[in-house]
Amino acid sequence: MKTINIVAGGPKNLIPDLTGYTDEHTLWIGVDKGTVTLLDAGIIPVEAFGDFDSITEQERRRIEKAAPALHVYQAEKDQTDLDLALDWALEKQPDIIQIFGITGGRADHFLGNIQLLYKGVKTNIKIRLIDKQNHIQMFPPGEYDIEKDENKRYISFIPFSEDIHELTLTGFKYPLNNCHITLGSTLCISNELIHSRGTFSFAKGILIMIRSTD
């Protein structure tokens, strides 16, 4: 499975051990200060993106020396650094894109990063946002299998569209059958699987799933 992992410049204390997310099929991309986070973890990114306005001159020289390819942008532009890096990753058509370093900083950036998940829905490429407490994904209509993860026991479903039609949860502590939920609903916050596996399905809308721990 081809994986592209992107590390943005969020607080390092919220980023999990990155060495647990790599294998011979994984490409790593650094975004702005996230490139320094990668180098500190002993991982050399294949590409680095950003205006690099949040790093020191010493860190910039370190990135220039280590990264095989550097994409430098003006601070004033029409896309965020992460958005530009994600577009590059999507063009490579991987099986999955995992993004780290996207929580714990500015709320406007975080909400913008949540919206970037929609690019995965449009291109049929799985995108997952990851920090130490949360895994966040976005889904189009369909039926999906889900495995229990004791490290991320809580599972929440949040509408990203005005309506979610015929939402069904099977194998959950709080099951649903063909339920209609609307934007702003908190009905599906903090559910749990009661078996090793479960399923969720819906007929119309766009749904965010968050798997989390305290």
From Swiss-Prot:
Keyword Repeat: no
Pathway(s) this gene product operates in, as recorded in its UniProt entry: Cofactor biosynthesis; thiamine diphosphate biosynthesis; thiamine diphosphate from thiamine: step 1/1
Keywords linked to the UniProt accession: ATP-binding, Kinase, Nucleotide-binding, Transferase
GO biological process: thiamine diphosphate biosynthetic process; thiamine metabolic process
The keyword Methyltransferase is assigned to this record: no
SUPFAM superfamilies: Thiamin pyrophosphokinase, catalytic domain, Thiamin pyrophosphokinase, substrate-binding domain
Principal EC category: transferase
InterPro entries per record: Thi_PPkinase, Thiamin_PyroPKinase_B1-bd, TPK, TPK_B1-bd_sf, TPK_catalytic, TPK_catalytic_sf
EC number: 2.7.6.2
UniProt catalytic activity: thiamine + ATP = thiamine diphosphate + AMP + H(+)
GO molecular function, one term: kinase activity
CDD domains found in the cross-reference section: TPK (cd07995)
NCBIfam families registered for this protein in UniProt: thi_PPkinase
Annotated function: Catalyzes the ATP-dependent phosphorylation of thiamine to thiamine pyrophosphate. Is involved in thiamine salvage.
Family listed: Belongs to the thiamine pyrophosphokinase family.
Protein name, per record: Thiamine pyrophosphokinase
Species for this entry: Bacillus subtilis (strain 168)
Lineage, highest ranks first: Bacteria, Bacillati, Bacillota, Bacilli, Bacillales
